[in-house]
Amino acid sequence: MWTEKAAAMAEAQESGCRNKSSISRQTPVAGAVTEDDEAQGVFKPMDLNHVIKLLEETNKDGLEEKQLKFVKKLVQCYQNGLPLRDLAQIFKILNLCAGKIKNQPRFIESAYDIIKLCGLPFLKKKVSDEITYAEDTANSIALLGDLMKIPSSELRIQICKCIVDFYHAEPPKKHIPGYQQACSSYKIQMAEVGGLAKTMVQAVTLLENQLVEKLWVLKVLQHLSTSEVNCSIMMKAQAASGICAHLNDPDPSGQLLFRSSEILWNLLEKSSKEEILPQLSNLECLLALKEVFKNLFMRGFSHYDRQLRNDILVITTIIAQNPEAPMIECGFAKDLILFATFNEVKSQNILVKGLKLSNSYEDFELKKLLFNIIVILCKDLPTIQLLIEGSVVLALFTYVKKPEKQRTIDWSAAQYEELQLHAIATLSSVAPLLIEEYMSCQGNAQVLAFLEWCEIEDSFFSHGNSFHGTGGRGNKFAQMRYSLRLLRAMVYLEDETVNTDLCEKGTIQQMIGIFKNIISKTNEKEEAIVLEIQSDILLILSGLCEHHIQRKEIFGTEGVDIVLHVMKTDPRKLQSGLGYNVLLFSTLDSIWCCILGCYPSEDYFLEKEGIFLLLDVLALNEKKFCNLILGIMVEFCDNPKTAAHVNAWRGKKDQTAASLLIKLWRKEEKELGVKRDKNGKIIDTKKPLFTSFQEEQKIIPLPANCPSIAVMDVSENIRAKIYAILGKLDFENLPGLSAEDFVTLCIIHRYLDFKIGEIWNEIYEEIKLEKLRPVTTDKKALEAITTASENIGKMVASLQSEIIESQACQDVQNEQKVYAKIQATHKQRELANKSWGNFLARTSNAKTLKKAKRLQEKAIKASRYHERPQHAIFHPTDIKGLNTTVPSGGVVTVESTPARLVGGPLADTDIALKKLPIRGGALQRVKAVKIEEAPKKSIPT
């Protein structure tokens, strides 16, 4: 496996390599180079096995000189690079030389020269050499770490230089025909495979008292720790704790601290937190970090010192996330709190006496890091006393106000804004733990005053160029967002002192005002942060008004209006991901906490069609909202005015509320795995409500105070709420239900009976499991209850069958009616076609016309009385002078008054006639005429 890993890593670097099934390895040769050959860069054959045998020989005269001569010759031969095929033999020679150093010190130079060669490029003759010799190369490089045990400072330093050169590869000095340089990362990969990092970590412990060599080893580890593989190896070798514990060791150059912190940083970044934090969370490591940080904080004035100080603080912050870290025991937590607050709260502590932060970037970052570590420290409850002693809340509240021109530290506007937001965010975590300190600082008053400033339009310009300032550029949304988060955190403590103080200061009215102000100013660019602000306002109002009728009355109609405004949001926006879902949840919560229970608010909500809006959201079939909406509707149904509104609602395709609720019931049962047939009928009359989960769970005896599975089922799904709503709407008078709905309604109607039967069945089964024998009367009672429950199931199943059969009959009747209608339509078309054919025949054939006329006259004659009644008026059927091709039909127009007297239809007559006709008969339209007066006759005298 180890060989395969090495080969795979090498193969990944050299794409297009040929697979080599079998490679015949010959005796490696190296070149003894003449001057001419060296100029050409060609390796001459040299028997490395002979050199190895020579070094293995002992007790011969002049042998040492001969051995040194051959090693020197070898070094000269490979001065341009090491071929991969010869690497195993060369390192074997190196190992033999190292073994002779103890008794023959002259071999130090030979070993030194060979190690120096390892810094040269590795050469390959074939593309596949990197894969073929991967195992040999990895073993050879691993040997370098083992050689660190040789007590030679010069040799150790050279080994470190050689390894560092792996990361700074240089091209070969001369090009050697037939060879090419291995890829630049090949040595690094082979070092990973060979586990070089482990031996180098062990070397740190070995060289504790030898500073120069130790610094070189740390430099090597600094390079090695850039790889995740090496970091994993180093972690197994306990590198983190070993390096961290010696951070504060004396070192005039400062390299030890720099390189150690860099290694720790890489280990934290590239290793799993679960593995590294336990190594660093010990008293020794934290004491070392504490001393280093204090020294850098108090005496570090250079740019480099400040950067290193911040790096140490970041490492400490990560360690502090581990609850097991003894931050309090080592005194580090107390010092960090002091450093975080000494600028805002005066302290006589000698550590900060005379200290002052500048507005440099490093000090600015330090301030943010200190705020951040306070948030982490406050998660450990024993730290609370330190936070109180350090006046952390008071220090943080110095930022909860309008920016001032004169400040302790001359931060830039952008820096101060970011610190202000960071401080308020920190307060959101700290203040809920320190309620007394919060109230003693008049926290509510300060936050509400700050919110008033956030609403005012003034010359303040927000930069919005930080994480906390996101979405707040050119406005005060970021400040408002974090202030509301702080208030929300305090309100949800449900501390009556805090909430009463807020209400007395007019928080409810102020929150409603802020909400109205925000919705009046549409800002699409900052939509996400605006939605978050609205959600927080509604949550604050919910927290304040819950269980308090007087506060609900203060919420009043203005509060209901903002709730209704949110409820009218376009449903398509719920899928936008901007926060509309959260806002809707907050709105539903505010309906529950701020409206329900206050009858004037409930009535106003109903008047404004609030129930319609709730049902509209319910009809969206979003499961995450259903449970909450149904719970709200159950409470609303206690109001007698609600039923009319619910029954009046109509959804898509004229769906009623009852039909919607029954549809939700069916969907819920399908998801729960309740057994029903294709028509929705009960299958198992003994367990009509059983879910698949209940079927899987075996009944086990439980204590009396533990709810059983049947009881828990009531609260874990929406069936009980649907039953309650339909029960309050009256099961007998639900409009707009189909036969399928009625089948389901039969089950819903008996939900409570079925559930009671389930619980009694559980009791009976538990008694059996516990092997208890109830008295005869109790046993009979249990059996009677079980039988009654089953009978109810059978009765409901029978009723469902009747409904289904009745619907089937109704469907058949409807089908027959439709079929009869279709038949009548076809028959009418046939009659119309026949009539049209007769008409065409009469108009095209005179004989047919005469025949039709005779038949008509005959029919008319047959319809008359044979004896004419007395005083009867005879009306002829033929109209003289009528020129038509069609004889008169069966409709006879009778006019007893001549048309000249009628004057046409009366529909067009003027009501105000100028002059009545003098001819009698019906009124007719006459033209207005001017009547001239008759000449007066002279009366004879």
Swiss-Prot record:
Major place of residence: other
Record keyword Ribosomal protein present: no
RNA-binding as UniProt keyword: no
Keywords per UniProt: Cell projection, Cilium, Differentiation, Flagellum, Olfaction, Sensory transduction, Spermatogenesis
SUPFAM superfamilies in UniProt: ARM repeat
InterPro entries with a match to the protein in the record: ARM-like (IPR011989), ARM-type_fold (IPR016024), CFA69 (IPR048732), CFA69_ARM_dom (IPR048733)
GO terms, biological process: cell differentiation; olfactory behavior; positive regulation of fertilization; positive regulation of flagellated sperm motility; response to odorant; sensory perception of smell; spermatogenesis
Compartments it resides in: Cell projection, Cilium; Cell projection, Cilium, Flagellum
One Pfam family it belongs to: CFA69_ARM_rpt
Domain of life: Eukaryota
GO cellular component: cytoplasm; non-motile cilium; sperm midpiece
Described purpose of this protein according to its UniProt entry: Cilium- and flagellum-associated protein. In the olfactory epithelium, regulates the speed of activation and termination of the odor response and thus contributes to the robustness of olfactory transduction pathways. Required for sperm flagellum assembly and stability.
PANTHER family: CILIA- AND FLAGELLA-ASSOCIATED PROTEIN 69 (PTHR14716:SF0)
Name used for this protein in its record: Cilia- and flagella-associated protein 69
